[in-house]
Amino acid sequence: MQCPTCQNTDSRVLESRSADTGKSVRRRRECLNCSFRFTTYERVETMPISVIKKDGSRELFNKDKLVTGISRACEKTTFSRESIINFVDSIESQIVQDSNKDIKSSQIGELILKGLRKENEVAYIRYASVYRKFNGVKDFVSTLESLKGSSKNELASIL
């Protein structure tokens, strides 16, 4: 590993430990040339995943897009930023396990909806309204009915 101060490539590892909930290894190193101590992180390199969009075009999987979309759905809820990151990490893990390098955007959307339904009902409704392109109150009502199993009459009296 190259020293950040003298650029020497000889270093020794002083300490190693698991980091990022087991997804990486944190190593404390010391340069054999200048004795500067620095930290490195090692993680498994994953194969790039291609997302097949609705129009048939492809783009590389971008975790940041998921974080942004889910963050919008979770605004003003009890879902913390850390919870969002952990949620997106779990979605990414499912995608990596389930796909061979290609996944449809609709499959990603359904994974997110399935997870949000368990985690936070408000975020689920918000995400579903954008993902499924709700056109009016009826779309919200039918989603609320499926979420709670309520009858139309009960919801109509509330609205």
From Swiss-Prot:
GO MF annotations in UniProt: ATP binding; DNA binding; zinc ion binding
Residue ranges the record marks as coiled coil: none
Record domain ATP-cone: where: 49-139
PANTHER family linked to this entry: TRANSCRIPTIONAL REPRESSOR NRDR
UniProt name for this protein: Transcriptional repressor NrdR
InterPro entries: ATP-cone_dom, NrdR-like_N, RNR_NrdR-like
Gene Ontology terms describing biological process: negative regulation of DNA-templated transcription
HAMAP family: NrdR (MF_00440)
Zinc finger feature spans (unnamed): 3-34
Family: Belongs to the NrdR family.
Swiss-Prot/TrEMBL keywords: ATP-binding, DNA-binding, Metal-binding, Nucleotide-binding, Repressor, Transcription, Transcription regulation, Zinc, Zinc-finger
Cofactor(s) listed: Zn(2+)
Organism: Prochlorococcus marinus subsp. pastoris (strain CCMP1986 / NIES-2087 / MED4)
The organism's place on the tree of life at top rank: Bacteria
Cofactor binding remark: Binds 1 zinc ion.
Primary role: Negatively regulates transcription of bacterial ribonucleotide reductase nrd genes and operons by binding to NrdR-boxes.
